[in-house]
Amino acid sequence: MALDKTTVAKIATLARLDIEEDRMEALAGELSGILDWIEQLAEVDTSGVAAMTSVADLALAWREDAVTDGGYADRVLANAPESQDGCFLVPKVVE
């Protein structure tokens, strides 16, 4: 797909890029090359290839879904100036 300077200028405007006039011809050639490569990729037969979301075949380890208290309450409350019944105790700010 061959792009001309007018199309490159329109793309630059849409992308909010300020491209100097003397660079338009070179960019038109580079973008045309990129689009030609994409067209080649579109021609590849992928009918026998399974769809994938990542190139790495990763699987997460499953664990039992159980509710716990986390075991951090004592360590977290140790940072509080004051605590009461397992909660932070803060000064009253509203009368």
Curated annotation (Swiss-Prot):
Signal peptide: none annotated. Heterotrimer of A, B and C subunits. It catalyses: L-glutamyl-tRNA(Gln) + L-glutamine + ATP + H2O = L-glutaminyl-tRNA(Gln) + L-glutamate + ADP + phosphate + H(+); L-aspartyl-tRNA(Asn) + L-glutamine + ATP + H2O = L-asparaginyl-tRNA(Asn) + L-glutamate + ADP + phosphate + 2 H(+). It comes from Rhodospirillum rubrum (strain ATCC 11170 / ATH 1.1.1 / DSM 467 / LMG 4362 / NCIMB 8255 / S1). GO terms for molecular function: asparaginyl-tRNA synthase (glutamine-hydrolyzing) activity; ATP binding; glutaminyl-tRNA synthase (glutamine-hydrolyzing) activity. NCBIfam families: gatC. Allows the formation of correctly charged Asn-tRNA(Asn) or Gln-tRNA(Gln) through the transamidation of misacylated Asp-tRNA(Asn) or Glu-tRNA(Gln) in organisms which lack either or both of asparaginyl-tRNA or glutaminyl-tRNA synthetases. The reaction takes place in the presence of glutamine and ATP through an activated phospho-Asp-tRNA(Asn) or phospho-Glu-tRNA(Gln). PANTHER family: GLUTAMYL-TRNA(GLN) AMIDOTRANSFERASE SUBUNIT C, MITOCHONDRIAL. Its EC number is 6.3.5.-. Keywords: ATP-binding, Ligase, Nucleotide-binding, Protein biosynthesis. This is Aspartyl/glutamyl-tRNA(Asn/Gln) amidotransferase subunit C. Coiled coil: none annotated. Belongs to the GatC family. GO terms for biological process: glutaminyl-tRNAGln biosynthesis via transamidation; regulation of translational fidelity; translation. The gene is gatC. SUPFAM superfamilies: Glu-tRNAGln amidotransferase C subunit.
